[in-house]
């Protein structure tokens, strides 16, 4: 068995570095969890004036294996490289993990790279059903499938939802074709969701959308009742499937304005969706944790007791970046991508859309599909 510990300022009650160092001296195998942000503070690698002895000892310790999760983040700076160089001793094995390693690939030889992606995952999922002649394999268009706990052999990939990407041209959904970016002459989310600001704007108008009528028309279009529509809230079946969605918008002011506008629409007044705004200007561990707790509470998930009432609630989470990487919100079944363009960084886009591909089972029903509603078709096709 392994002993585990975290950095001293962690409040989880786990052992600290010195506890597991003593365990290691006594022949016990140990695991130590520490954040890159914590180690980057050390003066040893050029960080802030932090002479913490613990940080020095962690960096100087002779580790057998160092695993860097989300290795595409914060490791390519001078401080990040300094941390890695200090941890990497002669004989230390290094494992870099990333779902979007685009900025790392040129630093490794081909034989050093192991790739397991969504396409392989879904291929193995289908192949397993074919090899085992699984007649119960899901062929239903439904987003949730019943779980059969009496199956003799269970597909090990069955909990991993298939992703569907649907594209729409927002400018054609409303009369927004005339709303164009001044520099490019093309439609842009930033202009569409532009918020009135400045001292020359009447106080009662500040914080409202400049093109409020068009934004409101867009929201109404999303939930306009229609049997053959593919908009996420256009019929009762879709509304049940998309109880909990993530909407990615251009910025903080835009998220604030959209929350106020949504709360005036039938999505909130009749369908009882609760809007949770987690958009913020900064992203540290504490703020991300607070935002996650805020979302889970609104959804009806209690982390302490493990209770899950997400099938009884409805939420829309608004973000301009927060909770779009390294976070799991299992009840999310769709993301509405309402920012950026075809030049959006691939890593940003992929990290965001795969927030909704997390496994989720509740009351015997398992999420078998998840959706991306992308309102910039050029992005999804490039």
Regions found by a protein language model. Name each.
Residues 62-63, 89-93, 160-163, 271-273, ...:
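Short glycine-/polar-rich loops that comprise or flank the Walker A/P-loop
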Residues 1-36, 43, 48, 52-58, ...:
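Conserved C-terminal RecA-like helicase domain
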């Amino acid at each position: 068995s392994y002993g585990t510990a975290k950095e001293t300022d962690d409040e989880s009650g786990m052992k600290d570095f010195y506890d597991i160092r003593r365990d290691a001296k006594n022949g016990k195998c140990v695991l130590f969890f520490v954040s890159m942000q914590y180690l980057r503070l050390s003066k040893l690698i050029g960080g802030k004036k932090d002479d913490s002895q613990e940080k020095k000892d962690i960096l100087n310790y002779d580790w057998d294996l160092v695993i860097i999760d989300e290795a595409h983040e914060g490791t390519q700076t001078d401080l990040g490289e300094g941390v890695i160089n200090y941890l990497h001793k002669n004989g230390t094995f290094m494992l870099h993990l990333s779902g979007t390693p685009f900025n790392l690939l040129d630093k490794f030889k081909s034989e050093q790279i192991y790739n397991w992606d969504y396409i392989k995952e879904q291929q193995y999922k289908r192949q397993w059903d074919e090899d085992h002649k699984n007649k119960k394999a899901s062929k239903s268009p439904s987003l949730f499938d019943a779980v059969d706990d009496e199956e003799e052999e269970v597909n090990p990939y069955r909990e991993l939802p298939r992703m569907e990407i649907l594209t729409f041209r927002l400018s054609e959904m409303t009369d927004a074709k005339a709303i164009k970016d001044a520099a490019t002459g093309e439609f842009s989310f930033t202009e569409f969701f532009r918020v009135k600001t400045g001292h020359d704007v009447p106080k009662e108008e500040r914080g409202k959308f400049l093109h409020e009528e068009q934004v409101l028309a867009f929201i109404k279009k999303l939930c306009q009742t229609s049997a053959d529509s593919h908009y996420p809230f256009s019929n009762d079946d879709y509304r049940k499937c998309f109880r909990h969605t993530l909407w990615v918008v251009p910025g903080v002011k835009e998220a604030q304005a959209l929350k106020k506008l949504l709360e005036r629409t039938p999505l909130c007044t009749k369908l009882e969706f609760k809007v949770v705004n987690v958009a913020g200007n900064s992203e540290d561990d504490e703020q991300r944790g607070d935002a996650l707790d805020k979302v889970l509470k609104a959804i009806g998930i209690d982390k302490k007791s493990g209770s899950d009432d997400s099938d009884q609630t409805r939420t829309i989470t608004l973000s301009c970046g927060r909770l779009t990487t390294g976070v799991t919100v299992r009840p999310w079944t769709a993301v509405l991508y309402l920012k950026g363009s075809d030049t959006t960084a691939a890593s940003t886009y992929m990290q965001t859309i795969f927030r909704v591909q997390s496994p989720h089972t509740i009351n015997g029903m398992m999420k078998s599909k998840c959706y991306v509603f992308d309102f910039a078709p050029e992005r999804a096709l490039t």
